[in-house]
Amino acid sequence: MARKKSRSSSTRKGSSLKVPEIKEKEKINAINTYEDVANSEDEFYNAQDKILFDADNGEQADELELSDEELVALESSSDEEDGNAEENLSENEELSGKKKDAVNEEELYDNKGWGRSAKSYYGGDDYDNEDYSEEDDEFDARMEEQEALRLQRKRLEKVSETDAIDDISQWADNSDLKSIKQDSSAAAIEELVQQISPDLPRTELLKILEAKHPEFQLFLDELNQLKPQLNEIKEKLKTYPSSQLLQAQCTALSTYISFLTFYFALLKDGEEDLKNHPIMVDLVRCKQTWESYCGLDEVLTPTSLEEDGKTIELHEKIASASDIGASEDEEDVDMHESISDNENEGIKDIPVAEDDDITLKFRAAKSKINTNIKNLDDYGEGNRLDDVDAEDKIARKRSLKFYANQIDQKAAKRSRAVLELSGDLDMPYKERRFERQQRLMREAAARGRNQDAGADLDDEDPESMGIPANVDREVEDQDDLDYYESLDKKSKMAKKLRKENHDLERDLIRASRHPELIELGEGDKRGITLDIAKNRGLTPRRPKENRNPRLKKRMRYEKAKKKLASKKAIYKGAPQGGYAGEQTGIKAGLVKSIKLQ
C-alpha cells in the first residue's frame, strides 16, 4: 500500500506569510444589530419610532410642542454665518424665555379667574339630576357670589388713578377735535357766504347754496314732481267724489306741498339755521304720511259715480218711507236688507281696493236696476243728499256700530241660506215615472177645467181629433226649464252669499290694518293686541313634567313602550274568556266615513 503524503510541507510554506498587526484605535465593536452601524440620522428616526409607555404627561407635552432642535445637521458655508446663527439663536432663546414667562403668568391668572371648579360654568341647566336639592343650589350660589367678589377685588387692585386720567385726557382731545372740525366747517361756510357777489356766475351760486343748505335741491325736485300728482288726484276726486282713499291722498299730498312751500318761504326771508327749525320735523311726518298713502291703489270704474248717485237716491226714498221713530242705525240696516233681498233691484256697491291676502275672486254680475225707481219722484223731496247728510253717513260707516250691524245682518242671511240649500236640494235628479204620471194627470185635469163644457171627451186618439201629439212634451220641456231656472237662481243666491262673506272679511281686515280710520265714540276703547292679551313676554315655554323628575322618567318609559309595541309583538297577558277567533281589528263603535251635509 502506498503511504499518504504528509502536509507538513504545506504548513511550513504557509507559516512563512506575514500577518498584519491591528492597532487599538482601529478596533470596532461586533456588529450584531442594525443600530451598531446606524448614523446620526438613523438614530433620530429610531428615537421617533419608540413608544414610551412609562413616560409622564409632561414629557409627552414637551414632545408635542414645537422645538428648535435641528433634524438634520447642515454644514455651514463660512464662519461668519456661524457667528450670525449663534447670535440669532441666543436672541430667540431670550424671546422664547420671555414668552414662556408671560404665558405662565397668563395661565396662572386664567386659572384663578375661571374659578375653582368646572361645576360653576357647566351643567347650569341640567335640572334632571336626582341628587339635586335646594341646599346644593344655595351652596352654589354662595360660592358663585364669593368668587365674583374675589375677582372684582382682584381687578380693582390693578386699577390706578392714572388709568382714569389717561381716559379723561383722551376724551378731552376727541371733543377738542370735534369742536375744531365743527368750527372749521362753520367758518368755511361763512367765508363762502361772504364771497357772494352779484357778479358771480350761476354755477358758483348753486355751489354755495348746496354747501350751506344741502337739502334745498332735494326739496325742490320733490316739489316739482309732486305738483302734477296733486293735480291728477284732484281730477280723479272730481270724477269719484265718494272715494275715501282719494280724499286721504289729496289731503296728505296737499299738506306736504304746503310745508315744502313754507320751507322755501323761510329760506327766502333769510332764515339761517333751518336744520334745527321745527318745520323739519313736520316735513318728515308729512312725507311719511304721504308715502303710506302713495302705494295704495283703488279700483275705480266709469259707472261707479252713476251707481253711487242711484244708490243715494234709493236710500233717500226708502228712508222717507220708514217709520218716524226709527233710529238712524236701524234705518241704515233696513235699507241694506231691502236692497240685498230684492233680486230685481240688485245694485253694486262702490268698488274699493282689493286686499292681497284675500284670494277669493268673484265675477262681477250685471247690474239689474229696476226702471220703475227712476220714475219715482216725491214732491218736495231732494234728488241727492246734502253735504251735511253725506258727511253724517260717512261718519256712521266709520263707526264700530255700523260694522257690528253688518256682521249681524250677514250672519242672519248666511243661516237662512244654509237652511235653504242644505242636503241634496240643489242636486238635479231625473224625474221618476210615477211622479211624471201624477204631474201629467194634474196638468190634464187643469186643461179639462179650462175647456168648454161641451167638449167631446172619449177614448179616441188625440191625433185623430186634430190635437198635436207633442203637447205633453212641450209642457214637460217647460217644467224642466223652470226646474233648471230655479237651480240657477239658487246658485246665484249662493254666489251672492259668498261675495257678502268676502266683503265682510275684507272690511274687518281693512279696519284692523287702518285703526286710525275708525272713529271711537264716547266711552269706547281701543282693543288690545294679541301680545298684550297673552302677556307671555320673552320667557321660553318649559313643560311641567320637568319639575318632577320621577314623573318625567315615567312618561318617557311609557312613550318607549308604545314605540316598542309598534315594532314587535308584546305580550299583554292571557286572553280573557274563551277563544273567540282571530281578531280582525274592526271596531263596531268606530266610524271613519264622512257624513254628507
From Swiss-Prot:
Residues 71-94, 125-139 have a biased composition (Acidic residues). The keyword Nucleus applies. GO terms for biological process: maturation of SSU-rRNA from tricistronic rRNA transcript (SSU-rRNA, 5.8S rRNA, LSU-rRNA). The modification Phosphoserine is found at residues 40, 133, 327, 340. One of its GO terms (molecular function) is snoRNA binding. Keywords: Nucleus, Phosphoprotein. One of its GO terms (cellular component) is nucleus. It comes from the Eukaryota. It is found in: Nucleus, Nucleolus. The keyword Cell inner membrane does not apply. Residues 1-23, 71-143, 444-464 are annotated as: Disordered. Belongs to the SAS10 family. This is Uncharacterized protein C3B8.09. The lineage of its organism: Eukaryota, Fungi, Dikarya, Ascomycota, Taphrinomycotina.
